[in-house]
Amino acid sequence: MRVDIISVLPDFFDSPLANGLLRIAREKQRLQLHVHSLREYGLGKYKQVDDTPFGGGAGMVLRVEPVFACIEKLKADRDYDEVIFFTPDGKQFNQSEANRHALDRNLILLCGHYKAIDERIRETLITKEISLGDFVLSGGELPALIFLDSVARLLPGVLHDEESMLTDSFQDGKLDCAHYTRPSEFRGMKVPDVLLSGNHKKIEEWRLENAIERTRQRRPDLLKDINL
């Protein structure tokens, strides 16, 4: 998979891409990441990428010219499955979306900044808009990293234990069960006996029941789509 990230803050990605799972995905050549500075396509002596909004009002708006120039240059070299923009009014991102995008070959992630981006960019260039929730961030860089992490871990060979991925929360429509490790007792808090029993059938039954109960308590909305 190749992902091209467009941002006015390209250095923002240096540390996250050099550590953890994203570093592993790159080293294993499962993920090619290219970060493009939008200011390289800026206008005039000062490489301007934003301007005041028509009609007045607070904040600055990302201009059309730099974004068009960058994306058109990328598209001249290859086809892309999606051009994604992160925005609070986009489609809610979830595990199903991450699973789907793990099958893509080429993606462009446009990170917004300032108050907004010119609507003509959204109408013409953007093929998908994604929201992480009902809140506002200062830019699209953090959402882009969250998107990348959730997708990269699904790529073949990235996770050391791929079976672990199959039992993650949301993979089968419900939350994950509770987990414990050593010691079996700490300050009077004991691990459930069934997990120490060695009876794999009963352990799996406990985990399923625990996951369903946890989902019922914390995310009951998920259960309507599950046949229990």
UniProtKB/Swiss-Prot annotation:
What EC number is given for this enzyme?
A: 2.1.1.228
Q: Which GO terms describe its biological process?
A: tRNA N1-guanine methylation
Q: Report which reactions are catalysed by this protein.
A: guanosine(37) in tRNA + S-adenosyl-L-methionine = N(1)-methylguanosine(37) in tRNA + S-adenosyl-L-homocysteine + H(+)
Residues binding S-adenosyl-L-methionine: G112, L132, G133, D134, F135, V136, L137
* Entry GO terms, CC: cytosol
Signal peptide location: none
Q: Which UniProt keywords apply?
A: Cytoplasm, Methyltransferase, S-adenosyl-L-methionine, Transferase, tRNA processing
Q: Which Gene3D superfamilies is this protein grouped with?
A: 3.40.1280.10, tRNA(m1g37)methyltransferase, domain 2
Where in or outside the cell it occurs: the entry states:
Cytoplasm
Q: Which GO terms describe its molecular function?
A: tRNA (guanine(37)-N1)-methyltransferase activity
Annotated function: Specifically methylates guanosine-37 in various tRNAs.
Subunit record text: Homodimer.
Q: Please report which protein family the annotation says this sequence is part of.
A: Belongs to the RNA methyltransferase TrmD family.
**UniProt name for this protein:** tRNA (guanine-N(1)-)-methyltransferase
What gene is this protein translated from?
trmD
